[in-house]
């Protein structure tokens, strides 16, 4: 039950971030970037975002905002982390959950549950899904659609930590170069 709650919480956070980003005006770039647990380097107009706490790096059009929330549960607390930006016309998200060490779960079921709860959370239809092995990590990639947007996502299992990366864009504006740049730049750092 608490696994569902944690997955559902991550899904709600991702879904809320998508809705909020799509319905809010684009914020102007800050002259001094907000403090984040990351270092940045300019990379061809995009920013290399390095998260020490998340143990990953990724290229994004700008520095994402951070939302972290710890929730108590019957199996111990879990912490949901979410980084999100809107860079017209796309929305970019990276999220993960840190579970209590005593909480045990099935990794394959975790991948599918993250996918299913994300699709349900944004009221989308699952178009396709496929299993992947990325940099030695078990993963799935899926595509979901709402009436006007397409979402491509990868969910990784890295030890006990599920990561989810998402790019959402208008249905008629798929840019495979941008999608590949974002997905292929996501790298897990050794712990």
Range-by-range predicted roles:
Residues 35-79, 133-134, 183-191:
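N-terminal "mature-domain start" segment
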Residues 59-83, 114-159:
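Signature of long, low-cysteine stretches enriched in small and polar/charged residues
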Residues 52, 61-66, 109-125, 163-191:
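Surface-exposed amphipathic alpha-helical segments
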Residues 6-16:
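Bacterial N-terminal signal peptides
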Residues 1-4, 21:
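Positively charged n-region of N-terminal signal peptides that target proteins for export
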Residues 54, 88, 97-99, 147, ...:
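Solvent-exposed coil/turn segments that connect beta secondary-structure elements
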Residues 14, 20-46:
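Compositionally biased, proline/threonine/alanine/serine-rich low-complexity intrinsically disordered stretches
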Residues 80-109, 164-166:
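A short acidic-to-branched-hydrophobic micro-motif
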